[in-house]
Amino acid sequence: MKSFIAKQYACPVEYTLTLIGGKWKPVILWHLANDGIKRYGEIKKLLIGITHKMLSQQLKELEADGLIHREEYHQIPPKVEYSLTDKGKTLIPILQLMCQWGQENMEHI
């Protein structure tokens, strides 16, 4: 895990947002929760506007925080798959509520 985890947080929400906050992490987790195992290129296609550098960074952080698993297959061409860990799967109800809230409020923006 990252060294910043040792930081003292004012509340559990702050800690949670440190792990899943930002523009891309919740969306990456959402797609892995709904679609299951995905390869890097598949994730990249789903996230319109994300750069290669940003996607790589977000995936590395999610993996370091124990929310996703990276499976590397030693073959030609190289193959890497991403999936939710058990810890990552515990976020599914939160992601579902975020989706529901978005569906109910998106048209009002």
Where are these predicted regions, by residue range?
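Recognition helices and adjacent regulatory flanks at domain boundaries
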Residues: 1-9, 46
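Short loop/turn motifs at secondary-structure junctions and domain boundaries
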Residues: 7, 73-74
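Basic amphipathic alpha-helical segments that dock to polyanions
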Residues: 55, 59-62
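N-terminal amphipathic/basic helix or basic patch
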Residues: 8-11, 93
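Basic, amphipathic "hinge/linker" alpha-helix immediately C-terminal to the N-terminal HTH DNA-binding motif
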Residues: 74-97
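Alpha-helical linker/hinge and terminal dimerization helices associated
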Residues: 65, 94-106
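N-terminal helix-turn-helix DNA-binding core of bacterial DNA-binding proteins
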Residues: 11-54, 75, 81
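A short, conserved structural fragment
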Residues: 63-71
